[in-house]
Amino acid sequence: MLRSLFVDFNSYFASVEQQIKPHLRGKPVGVLPVMARGTCCIAASYEAKAYGIKTGTSVMDAKRLCPEIVFVEAQHAIYVEFHQRAVAAVERIAPVRQVLSIDEMECELTGSWRNRDKAMAIAHDIKREILSTVGSCLRCSIGIAPNTMLAKLASDMQKPDGLVVIEQAELPERLHPLKLQDVQGIGKRMLQRLQVAGIFSMAELCAAPRGVLHSVWGGVAGTEMHDMLRGQWYGPRNTTARSLGHSHVLPPELRNTEGALGVLMRLTQKAAMRLRKQGFYATAMSISVRCDHRYQATPGGGRDAQFGQMQDTGFFLDVLHKLWHSGLQEL
């Protein structure tokens, strides 16, 4: 049964830049956190990706790969504005159940919408609405599946401007060609734990008994993973949160000052989106960085900040830069 429709905008930051600056359309574009020679791309247009440029590619390497690339400095307030317009466009077609980040959102399919043909028609309507009311440069890939995790996987299977449906009857075999790291929640450490358990491929993950995955994940998350790979639906848990945040393990090419700051900016945006979506306000913000087996905690040294009730992404980004330049970037 199809229950989730996942919308993932393609090369979002770069696409917004091409939308507001027509002279960039059709050209390779790299989005930088700051206009500096020693920084790296936090986003790249599909024209740039064709040359091998991606998130984390340094300015120097990008120039070497594509001498005609155009660099622009990130404009986060504008990205937030376009995000709000995109959410409104999707909501005119189907109710948005949750916004997961600045370029991802999910709609829950109900009633007749769970029919494959109807779900695909809704997806096409969403694409048309975005192109006509948000911008012709804003393309998205849509995944449709029995649950959120599978719908997100489906949205990654065909880019750009893709539409992929995974049906219950196709599971779990449809997932076998994927990599383990394609599954949300399987990072470097979880991959190592899976390998210790003798699981090296997606086919082996899908074949693993529920008890094995319960042990690997160390709890109910493993049981849920087993079930979700087979199409089981898990709705959001009713919990009361006092804080929310995001973390990310930097790939080797981003393990530098500019790369870390660029990722922190993305994480801040994602957290701010969730904050507003859940109707909360923040009165404090903290950041922490783990460096080469050392951990720099947030208390002291200007790594946290208190303020009045806030929801604004721009405000949080200003706080982030103040915390970063207070000395955290020197770790």
Each predicted region: which residue ranges?
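DNA-contacting surface of Y-family translesion DNA polymerases
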Residues: 6, 195-331
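Gly/Gly-Pro- and Ser/Thr-rich, intrinsically disordered tail segments characteristic of DNA damage-repair
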Residues: 1-233, 273
